[in-house]
UniProtKB/Swiss-Prot annotation:
Ubiquitinated by SMURF1; leading to proteasomal degradation. The lineage of its organism: Eukaryota, Metazoa, Chordata, Craniata, Vertebrata. Residues 326-856 form the USP domain. The gene is UBP5. PROSITE patterns: UBA, USP_2, USP_3, ZF_UBP. This is Ubiquitin carboxyl-terminal hydrolase 5.
Length: 858
């Protein structure tokens, strides 16, 4: 490289910017690859746009955008010097005292076992003229000051990825409870002693909670590992509705742990001293005798590395490196994302769409490629498949690796992808653990949005479901079809092969808990796969079915079949369910999944000879056998004007209020719960719950229910104002018809952003309507643009499959635990556990959560 002259630097001085508070500085990762400052070529940060690029891509940015001056960062690792007081190479590590990241007393993510030597240069393209950071002294003051301030600001600025990951996350920041100033306490309570407490329903003497309404002392929740309490405090809340409780043993003059069951979170109670004095407790005289919830959670986070389930940790595994064997770093509860994308990029259709067309995608990328979906997915696919990042962890300065690092690779850290895919989503934008199945569907939805008029790899998963409903009173039937991407397989626990052992285990467990003894060895339910398949295809009774043949309620049976078989069949084992108390729980079950699978018997047949269809008549808004004005709807009983405040029709449907209340108590929005009950035809809590789970990601999930033919709430002004032509043009340019654009805008009060979300969440209905318009004689030009397919495109073929991948989950809930995946490559099973990629010796195929089957060529 040539030395940078004063004249060259003066020529680019006007383009050098100093980053401000709102600027995103991408100095950790290349926008097009996973190169970092630690990569061989270092990282070039544009001093105008603050985007980072590896050596391979920096000229692409220069040629496309024009800025010539870049800050070149190159870092090399060296081991930390040995601390003489510890006798090891590691300095004394501070024990975290707060459940926080990036704040005093919290977890320090910057702590490493090595130090970094940093080389900083200013480089001007295209000739790569350079000058070292400390070589600016001989330049004129105006030049030196401008460049130095920009360099120092870039180096000191928080990187975009750091802001995304950390955001000074503090798990101890609590909100004031909404009950704090209005809590009603019962009169004449018992006086609570300052010590010697015991649960009033069992003999537990720790993890005790004092209810601030009635003074009851009860034990806390049971933790995932069997420790903790017996759930008596939360059960008391469900029985009484008394919302606030304080953890005994944590009360000090400075405060205490207060939990709100109603708000489902740790909270602040500014009136705590007053509330405690009601029971004779003087906060000023209390001392801490038990661990706070923060301390317990920190201990749990520090022990999480000890988990060995499903990871084949008891067996020596051979590490694998090279193309297709790239690990992914865990960015903090991101293992759900890692597992899903690893499987997707093992499928040829996703490879062809994004990796094979990498250059074309990058060439068409916008000025800021970090915000482009196709660019970031292509970058992710290339990072996984190229082998460039599938290398052992670099050796330390003495040429050795610690033993536990021998099977670990650097892998890739998909920070930009995670930030983009989760942008605007209430869950996936956080660092909390998520459900891999929900993320799979979210990613499928994002791919769908970005492949509207081009090759769509989602077609490998898409299939049609045929649902047949038969009215038992008239024997008449109704067939419907819908698009799906996942086969959700129920787990009939009553079909377990080891029922006696399970009953014996439960009895031993109960006795051990009563006697405070060690729990017996776990006995897991063994359910045959054939029983799960039978349960999926079994007829399901539908009570209170509105029969259009009878024009009255009847009983019906519903059967579910496949109208088409996809190239890749995704099966979710429904391990996560709800107990009788509506508390989420995970079924601890073993299902021996077959390597070869034939579901040909589940193919739908459509309307059969001799079957008579139910009349296609819409049910009445208020069925004759239901009282008007009930279930929370408003109106004068002497008039026929009964309507919900959310509905515009004066004769709104009667919904099962008990089911709505159950769903609302679980934390779902009221309007979403009303829609769930409405769209499942008042067919019960389970059906409504399934609807909620299937539609949680819909953009209009929490919007009020708008009945067919009604304008919906707040639509008066929109109806009066025609949709703006520029909004219509924008939607049409995305490949939709003018009719579809107008319909979407009218349904969303002419909001362009909401209209786009609405049109994607109703795409199947719109395509079906367009197809119907064509069949009724309208021209294709009048009904739908040529670029929009008529109906969902599905592939079909034989129903014979072979297992090629599965995702496993460890933990008691989708909101915690860990995910790993196993993928069959080159005839052998491979386990992907974050940065560890190894040949699998005993793949736990019976303990998976999501299974991926590939069609067998006939």
């Amino acid at each position: 490289m040539a030395e940078l002259s004063e004249e060259a630097l003066l020529s680019v001085l006007p383009t050098i910017r100093v980053p401000k508070a709102g600027d995103r500085v991408h100095k950790d990762e290349c926008a097009f690859s996973f190169d970092t400052p630690e990569s061989e070529g270092g990282l070039y940060i544009c001093m105008n746009t603050f985007l980072g690029f590896g050596k391979q891509y920096v000229e692409r940015h220069f040629n496309k955008t024009g800025p010539r001056v870049y800050l070149h960062l190159r870092r090399t690792r060296r081991p930390k010097e040995e601390d003489p007081t510890t006798g090891t190479g590691d300095p004394p590590r501070k024990k975290p005292t707060r459940l926080a990241i990036g704040v005093e007393g919290g977890f320090d993510l910057s702590e490493e076992k090595f130090e970094l030597d940093e080389d900083v240069k200013i480089v001007i393209l295209p000739d790569y003229l350079e000058i070292a950071r400390d070589g600016l002294g001989g330049l004129p003051d105006i030049v030196r000051d401008r460049v130095t301030s920009a360099v120092e600001a870039l180096l000191s600025a928080d990187s975009a990825s750091r802001k995304q990951e950390v955001q000074a996350w503090d798990g101890e920041v609590r909100q004031v409870s909404k009950h704090a100033f209005s809590l009603k306490q019962l009169d004449n309570p018992a006086r609570i002693p300052p010590c010697g407490w015991e649960c009033s329903k069992c003999d537990m003497r720790e993890n005790l909670w004092l209810n601030l309404t009635d003074g009851s002392i009860l034990c806390g929740r049971r933790y995932f590992d069997g420790s903790g309490g017996n759930n008596h405090a939360v059960e008391h809340y469900r029985e009484t509705g008394y919302p606030l409780a304080v953890k005994l043993g944590t009360i000090t003059p400075d405060g205490a742990d207060v939990y709100s069951y109603d708000e489902d979170d740790m909270v602040l109670d500014p009136s705590l001293a007053e509330h405690l004095s009601h029971f004779g407790i003087d906060m000023l005289k209390m001392q801490k005798t038990d661990k706070t919830m923060t301390e317990l959670e920190i201990d749990m986070n520090q022990r999480i590395g000890e988990w060995e389930l499903i990871q084949e940790s008891g067996v020596p595994l051979k590490p694998l490196f090279g193309p297709g064997y790239t690990g992914i770093r865990n960015l903090g509860n991101s293992c759900y994302l890692n597992s899903v994308v690893l499987v997707l990029f093992s499928i040829p259709d996703f490879q062809r769409k994004y990796v094979d067309k990498l250059e074309k995608i990058f060439q068409n990328a916008p000025t800021d490629p970090t915000q482009d979906f196709s660019t970031q997915v292509a970058k992710l696919g290339h990072g996984l498949l190229s082998g460039e990042y599938s290398k052992p962890v670099p050796e330390s300065g003495d040429g050795e690796r610690v033993p536990e690092q021998k099977e670990v690779q650097d892998g890739i850290a998909p920070r930009m992808f995670k930030a983009l895919i989760g942008k605007g989503h209430p869950e996936f934008s956080t660092n909390r653990q998520q459900d891999a199945q929900e993320f799979f569907l979210h990613l499928i939805n994002m791919v769908e949005r970005n492949c509207r008029s081009s090759e769509n790899p989602n077609e490998v998963f898409r299939f049609l479901v045929e649902e047949k409903i038969k009215c038992l009173a008239t024997e008449k039937v109704k067939y419907t079809q819908r698009v799906d991407y996942i086969m959700q397989l129920p787990v009939p626990m009553d079909a377990a092969l080891n029922k006696e052992e399970l009953l014996e285990y439960e009895e031993k467990k109960r006795q051990a808990e009563e006697e405070k003894m060690a729990l017996p060895e776990l006995v897991r339910a063994q359910v045959p796969f054939s029983s799960c398949l039978e349960a999926y295809g079994a007829p399901e009774q539908v009570d209170d079915f509105w029969s259009t043949a009878l024009q009255a309620k009847s009983v019906a049976v519903k059967t579910t079949r496949f109208a088409s078989f996809p190239d890749y069949l995704v099966i979710q084992i429904k391990k996560f369910t709800f107990g009788l108390d509506w508390v989420p729980k995970k079924l601890d079950v073993s299902i021996e999944m077959p390597e070869e699978l034939d579901i040909s018997q589940l193919r739908g047949t459509g309307l059969q000879p001799g079957e008579e269809e139910l009349p296609d008549i819409a049910p009445p808004l208020v069925t004759p056998d239901e009282p008007k004005g009930s279930l929370g709807f408003y109106g004068n009983e002497d008039e026929d004007s009964f309507c919900s405040p959310h509905f515009s029709s004066p004769t709104s449907p009667m919904l099962d209020e008990s089911v709505i209340i159950q769903l609302v108590e679980m934390g779902f929005p009221m309007d979403a719960c009303r829609k769930a009950v409405y769209y499942t035809g008042n067919s019960g809590a389970e059906a409504a719950m399934n609807w909620v789970m299937s539609h949680m990601d819909d953009p209009d999930f929490a919007n009020p229910l708008i009945l067919p033919g009604s304008s919906g709430p707040g639509s008066t002004s929109a109806a009066a104002d025609p949709p703006p032509e520029d909004c219509v043009t924008t939607i049409v340019s995305m490949g939709f018809s003018r009719d579809q654009a107008l319909k979407a805008l009218r349904a969303t009060n002419n909001s362009l952003e909401r209209a786009v979300d609405w049109i994607f969440s109703h795409i199947d209905d719109l395509d079906a309507e367009a197809a119907m318009d064509i069949s009724e004689g309208r021209s294709a030009a009048d009904s739908i643009s040529e670029s929009v397919p008529v109906g969902p495109k599905v592939r079909d073929g034989p129903g014979k499959y072979q297992l090629f991948a599965f995702i496993s989950h460890m933990g008691t809930s989708t909101m915690c635990g860990h995910y790993v995946c196993h993928i069959k490559k080159e005839g052998r099973w491979v386990i992907y556990n974050d940065q560890k990629v190894c040949a699998s010796e005993k793949p736990p195929k019976d303990l998976g959560y999501i299974y991926f089957y590939q069609r067998v060529a006939s």
